[in-house]
Amino acid sequence: MTSNKLKFSYFQLTFGQEEAYLHPEKTYQRLKKYGYDAIEITPPKGRYGLGVKLEDYLETHRQLKSDFGLEVSCINECWGEEWDPFSPDYKTLTESKTADLAVSETKSSVDFAAEVGAPLVTVAVAIHEDIGKDRVKECTEVAVDALQRMADYAKSKNVNLVLEATNHLEMGKFINTVFNHKRLIKYTRRDNIGIQLDWFHANFEELNPYEAVMDAHPLLWHMHFRDSNSLTPGYGNVDFKAVLRAVKKIGYNGYCTIESAPMIPDSDTAARVGIEYLRILESIVDYQLSPEFPNGYALKM
């Protein structure tokens, strides 16, 4: 168990592409104002970027990091065209051709992470077609091979990968739970692949948020704090107090990245309320886990 204070980050892309790629300084100003430690960014690729060049984006964030004293918590690998299965650039982990595209795309994000000083790159477990019992072995083998290639390249750059556990409605039925993510990671036999829990997705798939954290340990390296309705924490029904009790008990030292889509009621409010809400919960949880709870004093001999 740890009493270390949580580290907070924000997923920049949810502020919209215009801000993320054309005016990223607005995000840094906002996060610095409200006491964030870091920013999570998505490199300009595919349908993301509004024409901004990757090299220019890298230099911009290097300068903004220095100017505002924020870290980059993670590079969120959105794979550009992953939401359009009819695109020739569609990328998945479960079919050989599309997995090759995913490996190539992830390698470029690993390069970006190494250059900007981010410790992690997110990999989403996208699938192309429905997977049933008759295809699960084949698809698992393709996914393991792709992840091994990604992980080996990432290791050469001193970067770790995190698999985001996603809900079956968005990414299909394959490995939607923490348990199955751990199983897939075990098959890879690589020590630089962990788990990213997104509480919007987990709310669909996990039986209990406390158990999900405990089950993910010690591979829980990154988290997205998005509520059950995809809004800033506090606007839905995810039991974030239970989440924080669990992360304190396992000694979690990764970032808590807040996310909201859409921004309700606006970007400033979403960023401010999200961190204020979680800090209040953290103070409650710290006391609940202290020896002075609930009487106001600890037993002594």
Annotated model-derived regions:
Residues M1-A118, K137-E138, Q148, K155, ...:
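N-terminal pre-domain/capping segments
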Residues N4-L6, Y21, A38-I39, P44-K45, ...:
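Acidic/histidine-rich catalytic cores of soluble enzymes
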Residues G254-T257, S290:
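Substrate-binding cleft of secreted/luminal carbohydrate-active enzymes
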Residues A113-K133, V162-N167:
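Active-site groove signature of glycoside hydrolases
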Residues S9, S73, V121-T122, V162, ...:
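Structural detector of well-ordered beta-strand residues that form the stable sheet scaffold
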Residues T257-M263:
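Short acidic/histidine-rich active-site segments
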